[in-house]
Amino acid sequence: MKKRLDIAMVERGLAASRTQAQALVMEGKVRVAGQTEYKPSRQIDDAASVEVEAPPRFVSRGGEKLEGAFDRWGPALSAEGKTCLDVGSSTGGFTDCLLQHGAARVMAVDVGTNQLAYSLRVDPRLWVRENFNARFMKPSDLPETPSLAVTDVSFISLKLILPPIRDVLADGGEIVALIKPQFEVGKGNAPGGLVRDERLRIEARDGIVRFAEEELGLALLGLAESPIKGREMGNVEYLSYWRK
């Protein structure tokens, strides 16, 4: 019997989710019968050997992006013992990173459903709310008040997500937000989803910084290019670190 490679990887415990499996395959880290395979949809036999070069640290590559923030701004930036909020949790890369950094509680919210890796979903430190539009999030929507919030969202501007995050965050709380220029410059400036013009990328980044400072009263603690580019098109993205 044959089945898709990404499905087989999850069933064999080689990946925590199909999203993670697909990323590993497309990055050339998976071998089938000794040969590197680049198509997650490839049909393989049940008896076919599948090897992953190096087990990933997080359930998705998003975790490596947030890890870049901890590497750059820690120990001032810390999740240890904190109640945290992950807006746009998706597969759970940021959530996984927070838990591995000692978060006492992570509240994961996402507009989608059934995306979060099972290994995270069963963690007792996790509270999950799916089918939830964070644009309209209020303090009463959460079981606790977070002191650290992180966000990696797509197909929406941070100008619509940062205000509700600020409103639910504890006074003095911190935010790590991934600025994705491809969703800030307008479709006409990102043909095929890729922002090729560095000037537009910088303008998008700086526009979010001005908005957060001037409209939301947030204090910028750090700004740096993400160590990992956007998955689909290789877009340059930016990590931003804030205090309320």
What is each residue range found by the language model?
Residues 1-48:
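A basic, amphipathic helix-loop patch mediating RNA/tRNA/ribosome contacts
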Residues 79-90:
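Conserved class I S-adenosyl-L-methionine
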Residues 90-95, 112:
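Residues at the N-terminus of the alpha-helix immediately C-terminal to the conserved SAM/SAH-binding loop
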Residues 99-105:
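Conserved S-adenosyl-L-methionine
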Residues 107-156, 160:
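S-adenosyl-L-methionine
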Residues 159-174:
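A short glycine-rich, Lys/Arg-flanked "PGG" loop and its adjoining helix->strand segment in the class I
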Residues 172-185:
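Conserved beta-strand signature within the Rossmann-like core of class I S-adenosyl-L-methionine
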Residues 228-244:
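Core SAM-dependent methyltransferase catalytic element
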